[in-house]
């Protein structure tokens, strides 16, 4: 039986300069693809054009190259709008979408009026426009009517399992915003399927979004990839590094004369790996293989 080749990806948003947290995730995604002899893709998630910075594409490439991370193909989501439109058309033809004109304020008010409460950090949409129809004359988003039942996913790195009842814990979510921009969850699911991505290494902040992405992929006829969620890098206050929070850019280290080997060593040591003061990305490959072995990771020939 033939084993499908591993295809991994790093998918940054070009909304600013990469910081050390982005770099660590990029490193781990690259290590995973290369340690398993697979292909590695670079995909710019740039659908929200209002937040995109044109210089960030080249800066990101330079940062990755400086760290010794290569890739086999490059994509921009902004150049792939027809494939997202096709996915939306298929879901709509199946009767699984509906227009929604609710504002965030109206959604929160509806939840309060029904004596409900937000789950986690986001309110669960109560299905107002599905039940009562969209408001005429307003710009409308497009929501996916999530299927009934519970979706469970198991992380291939941590072996943790997460089960979510989508209607109760997530609610019908947006596929296309009311300004016409396709939503992250739609684009990432469509792209991973069409690009043949088998393994997704990404930050732990996306763990709770995984069940809805798996469900959406199934609705579009695609099998889910393996998901490996890695810890986020935090500052001295324990808060995650973020572009919006003013995390120092990797570019400043690169342009300031810092050695890439020292940065890679610091990233590796932040994961608890014992490495020299200077190390190359290639020299970290055995450590990632060992990490996978300890996690009981395996490749399912039938996946």
Curated annotation (Swiss-Prot):
Its cofactor is Zn(2+). Keywords: Aminoacyl-tRNA synthetase, ATP-binding, Ligase, Metal-binding, Nucleotide-binding, Zinc. Pfam families: tRNA-synt_1c. GO terms for biological process: glutamyl-tRNA aminoacylation; tRNA modification. A motif ('HIGH' region) lies at residues 12-22. Its EC number is 6.1.1.-. ATP binds at residue 243. One of its GO terms (molecular function) is zinc ion binding. L-glutamate binds at residues 9-13, 45, 184, 202. Transmembrane segments: none annotated. The keyword Coiled coil does not apply. Binds 1 zinc ion per subunit. Zn(2+) binds at residues 100, 102, 125, 129. It comes from the Bacteria. Belongs to the class-I aminoacyl-tRNA synthetase family. GluQ subfamily. HAMAP family: Glu_Q_tRNA_synth (MF_01428). Catalyzes the tRNA-independent activation of glutamate in presence of ATP and the subsequent transfer of glutamate onto a tRNA(Asp). Glutamate is transferred on the 2-amino-5-(4,5-dihydroxy-2-cyclopenten-1-yl) moiety of the queuosine in the wobble position of the QUC anticodon. This is Glutamyl-Q tRNA(Asp) synthetase. The lineage of its organism: Bacteria, Thermotogati, Deinococcota, Deinococci, Deinococcales. The gene is gluQ.
């Amino acid at each position: 039986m033939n084993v499908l080749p591993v295809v991994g990806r790093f998918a940054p948003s070009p909304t600013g300069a990469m910081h050390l947290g982005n770099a660590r995730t990029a490193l781990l995604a690259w290590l995973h693809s290369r340690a398993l002899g697979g292909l590695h893709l670079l995909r710019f998630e740039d659908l929200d054009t209002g937040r995109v910075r044109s210089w960030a594409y080249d800066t990101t490439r330079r940062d990755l190259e400086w760290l010794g991370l290569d890739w086999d193909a490059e994509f921009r989501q902004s150049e792939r709008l027809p494939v997202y439109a096709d996915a939306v058309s298929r879901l709509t033809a199946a009767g699984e979408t509906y227009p929604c004109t609710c504002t965030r304020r109206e959604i929160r008010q509806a939840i309060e009026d029904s004596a409900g409460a937000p789950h986690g950090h986001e309110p669960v949409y109560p299905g107002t426009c599905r039940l009562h129809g969209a408001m005429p004359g307003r710009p409308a988003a497009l929501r996916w009517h999530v299927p009934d039942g519970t979706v469970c996913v198991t992380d291939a790195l941590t072996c943790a399992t997460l089960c979510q009842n989508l209607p109760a814990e997530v609610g019908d979510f947006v596929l296309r915003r009311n300004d016409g921009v396709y939503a992250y969850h739609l684009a990432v699911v469509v792209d991973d399927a069409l690009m043949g991505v088998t393994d997704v290494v990404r930050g732990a902040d996306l763990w709770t979004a995984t069940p809805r992405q798996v469900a959406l992929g199934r609705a579009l006829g695609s099998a889910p990839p393996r998901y490996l969620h890695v810890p986020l890098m935090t500052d001295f206050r324990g808060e995650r590094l973020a572009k919006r929070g003013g995390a120092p850019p990797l570019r400043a280290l690169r342009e300031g004369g810092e050695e890439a080997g020292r940065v890679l060593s610091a990233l590796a040591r932040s994961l608890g790996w014992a490495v020299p003061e200077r190390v190359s990305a290639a020299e970290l490959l055995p450590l990632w293989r060992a990490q996978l072995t300890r996690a009981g990771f395996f490749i399912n020939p039938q996946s």
